[in-house]
Amino acid sequence: MTKPVIIGIAGGTGSGKSTIANAIQENVQQEITVITQDSYYKSFDNLPLEERHKINYDHPVSLDNELLISHLQTLKNNVPIEMPTYDFETHLRNKKTLTKNPSKIIIVEGILIFENPQLRNLMDIKIFVDTDADIRILRRIERDIQERGRNLHSILKQYRETVRPMHIEFVEPSKKYADVIIPEGGHNKIGIDMIVTKILSIMED
């Protein structure tokens, strides 16, 4: 089996990274393995819940990038991995893992995947999804309430204190590492078509 093509999709919270990943999957029509950086938060099980709530989860140090890099290298060698799962209400890693099998295309997506040089160097194509801040915060509110058991007050507090400052410090500057920048929150058909063409070209080489 040939080495897989690894595609990195970065962008701010709520920018449309999953939309791009789904669009690639629909258009390439190949089996795709999707790895989410959100699954690789460190498990701060040595701290009480109150202290875990205070951790800045938008800073790179909150992520277990060492494990993520190791897993991507393993997949690149055509070996399955056990991807961790994360409980966003307790801020702990679950005991349950998800088996991820290697495929011709591997997508890794997350807000900080371009911030780490070792992680960047594993990627064949780097995509940054560029979306206005007001749209991103609205999407984050909707997601965190529906999927992560959060309330509006805590979401807005986190946005002011960590999400926005960390976006300015780490996420936005990482845009310079992208091969392709897609505006309009992932709903850019021309941009997606160009990416799909490039992926197919790499796979044919």
Question: What residues fall within each predicted segment?
Answer:
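Short hydrophobic/aromatic beta-strand immediately N-terminal to the Walker A/P-loop
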Residues: 6-8
